[in-house]
Amino acid sequence: MAIVDVVVIPVGTDGPSVSKYIAEIQTKLKEYKAQGKIDYQLTPMNTLIEGDLKDLFEVVQAIHELPFDKGLSRVCTNIRIDDRRDKSRNMNEKVKAVEKYLNDGGN
């Protein structure tokens, strides 16, 4: 299972706020989650998405297109991929592994 850190930046909006575009992206992600393709987490600065890498590329393309569908002419999307293949860990398990070190030194 891979994890994608994605930031979709609509360019040329009518103001500094992009919340309405991000809300639309979250709605699209909810649809993919309902299909069982992904899990995701919204943060103040990005969205984390986990799933099969093939599905993640499909999802990233879909959310990249959303601002264009609303009439914008430019969108910048930043993507980071964590694709670990020796172990299968989801986002929550990765956080718990770090918390274990914080709480008891990893023992």
Curated annotation (Swiss-Prot):
GO terms for cellular component: cytosol. Transmembrane segments: none annotated. InterPro entries: MTH1187/YkoF-like, Thiamine_BP, UPF0045_domain. Belongs to the UPF0045 family. PANTHER family: UPF0045 PROTEIN ECM15 (PTHR33777:SF1). This is UPF0045 protein in glkA 3'region.
